[in-house]
């Protein structure tokens, strides 16, 4: 993941530091921002170069809806955005969820992205039965 999205790693780690120093009003915003970099960097890595600028400028929800085909990534990333948005907006929609739920869903999103990348590499290395 650090190769795919170094900005994700940096932003996530800064959000974690904010959380550890009890800056609870800003750490969620950082986690939400890190998610945006993770998703967009992932999409940029799998799309043709002529689409990169479109992805950079598109709203995150639209990127997930329009550009992610893997149902697992799409499903968990959407929910991570929902919780991340609760950290940035005045009114929470998911009052029974907190920062730990957001981090857990980001971790799950990471898992599915890593699995897809590793599977793709395996299929490239072993395209067919011999």
Placement of each model-derived feature along the sequence:
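Short, charged amphipathic alpha-helical segments flanked by flexible coils
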Residues: 40-78, 82-83
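Charged alpha-helical initiation segments
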Residues: 1-25, 112, 128
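Alpha-helix C-capping/helix-to-loop hinge sites
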Residues: 18, 41, 67, 87-94
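Amphipathic, well-ordered alpha-helical segments in soluble domains
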Residues: 11, 30, 34-37, 79-83, ...
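Charge-enriched, short contiguous segments at helix-coil
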Residues: 75-130
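Amphipathic, non-membrane alpha-helical segments in soluble helical-bundle scaffolds
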Residues: 1-5, 20, 24-28, 70-77, ...
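Short, conserved alpha-helical segments within structured domains
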Residues: 30-31, 56, 60, 102
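Short, hydrophobic, well-ordered secondary-structure elements
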Residues: 15-16, 23-42
């Amino acid at each position: 993941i650090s190769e795919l999205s170094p900005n994700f790693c940096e932003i996530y780690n800064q959000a974690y530091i904010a959380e550890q120093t009890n800056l609870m009003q800003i750490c969620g915003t950082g986690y939400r921002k890190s998610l945006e970099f993770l998703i967009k960097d992932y999409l940029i890595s799998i799309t043709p170069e002529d689409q990169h600028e479109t992805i950079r400028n598109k709203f995150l929800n639209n990127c997930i809806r329009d550009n992610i085909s893997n149902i697992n990534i799409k499903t968990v990333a959407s929910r991570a955005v929902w919780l991340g948005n609760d950290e940035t907006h005045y009114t929470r929609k998911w009052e029974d969820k907190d920062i730990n739920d957001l981090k857990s869903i980001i971790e799950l999103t990471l898992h599915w992205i890593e699995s897809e990348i590793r599977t793709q590499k395996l299929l490239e290395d072993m395209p067919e039965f011999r």
